[in-house]
From Swiss-Prot:
InterPro entries: ChyE-like, Class_I_gatase-like, GATASE. This is Putative glutamine amidotransferase-like protein C13C5.04. It comes from Schizosaccharomyces pombe (strain 972 / ATCC 24843) (Fission yeast). Coiled coil: none annotated. The keyword Transcription does not apply. Keywords: Glutamine amidotransferase, Transferase. Residues 13-217 form the Glutamine amidotransferase type-1 domain. GO terms for cellular component: cytosol; nucleus. The keyword Ribosomal protein does not apply. SUPFAM superfamilies: Class I glutamine amidotransferase-like. It comes from the Eukaryota. Gene3D superfamilies: 3.40.50.880.
């Protein structure tokens, strides 16, 4: 069967990433391909990327909505707290899909997780505990254990903003020590991660090394992040989980 996914691309990574691993939309496609292979699904995945951070008019048209099965919102170095016109437009679009077109599933990754939360009425703030970086243990809630079939998962992180609550109608599936609201789930409609299931260990380590010693990461933060990456994220498992959600 054809399964149509609109990828709302919210940024271009640093050149050190794009030259080796592609952009965020490419990483999402790789994630979906990986999940499809492990899940052994026979869907014919059809993706179209919309560069929403570049062009405020580059969105799926309403007449296309009946044929769209899902949207995926990528990560971004931009903040979901920003009043930038393109971010306001993105929040408005996601809110429209969330409340008016429930047949369209939504997956949000990091910035995308925050955009979905904000579209559902939850404020986003800068985490007073600072950055959360690299492979991080997510402790699953009771609902999270039911959804994933395990008690903990490791997810790559690269963020300093966070949601402050669970959106109405959503379930909280997991938390970390520094960020309580890590994974949101609305049955048969939305699945969002504060982390980056689409980031490989190599992608995270490259980002950390490029940003070390800058105003973003200190040398100590870099060393700690690289050490945590020795306990790799459960990317294959997460890819399968996302595909299973899309096929619910």
């Amino acid at each position: 069967m054809d399964y149509h996914i609109a990828i709302l691309n919210a940024d271009t990574p640093m050149v050190e990433i794009t030259s080796a691993y592609g952009d965020y939309a490419d990483m999402v496609k790789s994630l979906l391909q990986s999940g499809s292979e492990y899940y052994s699904t026979e869907w014919n995945l059809v993706t179209k990327t919309y560069e929403v951070y570049k062009n405020p008019n580059d969105y799926p048209q309403k007449e296309d909505f009946p044929n769209i099965n899902a949207i995926i919102i990528t990560g971004s170095k931009a903040s979901a707290t920003s009043d930038a016109p393109w971010i306001k437009k993105l929040i408005s679009f996601v809110k429209d899909v969330l409340f008016k077109y429930p047949h369209i599933k939504i997956v949000g990754l990091c910035f995308g997780h925050q955009i979905v939360a904000k579209a559902a009425g939850v404020p986003i703030i800068q985490n007073p505990k600072g950055w959360e970086v690299s492979s991080t243990v997510v402790q699953l809630t009771e609902n999270g254990e039911k959804f994933f079939g395990r008690k903990v998962i490791n997810i790559n992180q690269m963020h300093q903003d966070m949601a402050v609550d669970v959106p109405e109608g959503f379930e909280l599936l997991g938390s970390t020590e520094d960020c309580e609201f890590q994974i949101f789930y609305k049955p048969r409609q939305a699945l969002t991660f504060q982390g980056h299931p689409e980031f490989s260990t190599e992608v995270v380590n490259t980002m950390v090394k490029v940003l070390r010693g800058t105003e973003v990461f200190t040398e100590q933060q870099k060393e700690e992040a690289l050490k945590r990456s020795e306990n790799p994220a459960d990317n294959d498992f997460l890819a399968v989980s996302i595909v299973k959600f899309l096929l619910e």
